[in-house]
Amino acid sequence: MKRKAAALFGALCLVTLAACGGSDDTATEEVTEETTAPEESTSEVASLAGVCPDTITFQTDWNPESEHGFLYNMVGEGYEVDAAGLRVTGALVSKGQDTGVKIQVRAGGPAVGFTSPTSLMYSDPEIFLAFVSTDGAVQDSGEFPTMTVVAPFNINPQIIMWDPATYPNVKTIADLKATGAKVRYFGGAAYMEYFTATGILDSKQVDGNYDGTPANFVADGGKAAQQGFATSEPYYYQNVLTDWAKPVAYQTIHEAGWTAYAQSLGGKPDVVEANKDCLKLLVPMIQQSQVDYVTDPARANAVILDLVGQYNNGWLYDAGQAAAAVELGLSNGLIANSPDGTLGSFDLERVE
């Protein structure tokens, strides 16, 4: 794994803050401020004290999982867990060193009744940055404009998956159209509107009632396809879900033509503007944390599993899933440098 990470992330350099929100159709512009990622060294990390909020709060989009590992990797030892509030608070560390402020990471998705991170951020001023997809940012730009500042995932891990035994000739999402198979997804997803509008899938075959559980997929015996994450479901369905216990086939929605960024970190425009000096220091730390995490995920995964146990909210997640998510993120090219050679930067052609 360390060799994979070194090959992918040999050069951390510049990141340009990209804005999602505005009055035009694309709702995308470029912020001129640049941030410089830290050089690999053992030198003392920059202090965030007095530059950033005393506690930097991140709102995620799901329960604790490896896809959020770069955040949990920044939570220092001796962290405090609020099991009722489904959040963890600790010293914000970079390369193991205390930065002088605290970090709080909040669970999302089913933990918050599926309220979007953007909505939560607008209702709670304590949230500094939240998970924002660039397509969602465009959709919400009228009511809830956001500015995305870093993209830990270069490729959206969202997939459509199917049973290869039931559909041996299906190799892509587009191939599902001819089969007429039902395709379940979370209703309102912009990518599905794109798939049906462009004829990749038939509007009659898509079903927006996916509930995030495997029950219907298993009950259908593989006759229906459904959404998932390339870093999660392929491993889970084959190795953990005893009611299925066999491989699934899949394609990322990115490969099928929907190239928006997912799980980027963004904030309210006024907050981003007011905290430019903070972000110049913080964004490179986030970049570095993603590199450090995929190079050696053991400690952060231990934090994730500890939180899963303490939250005890019905979310089932084990060490095998946590480790597999990192491997799948790397092997599928989801965690990778942008075309400019930078981890975490935005290719603006993808969000226009």
Regions found by a protein language model. Name each.
Residues 1-9:
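Bacterial N-terminal signal peptides that target proteins for export
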Residues 15-19:
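C-terminal motif of bacterial Sec signal peptides marking the signal peptidase cleavage site
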Residues 20-31:
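Bacterial lipoprotein signal-peptidase II cleavage site
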Residues 44-210, 217, 224:
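Short, glycine-/small- and polar/acidic-enriched structural segments
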Residues 75-80, 165, 181, 196, ...:
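Sec-exported extracytoplasmic/periplasmic mature domains
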Residues 80-98, 168, 250-258, 273, ...:
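Short, solvent-exposed loop/beta-turn-alpha elements that line the ligand-binding surface or hinge
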Residues 152-162, 243-271, 283:
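Periplasmic-binding protein-like
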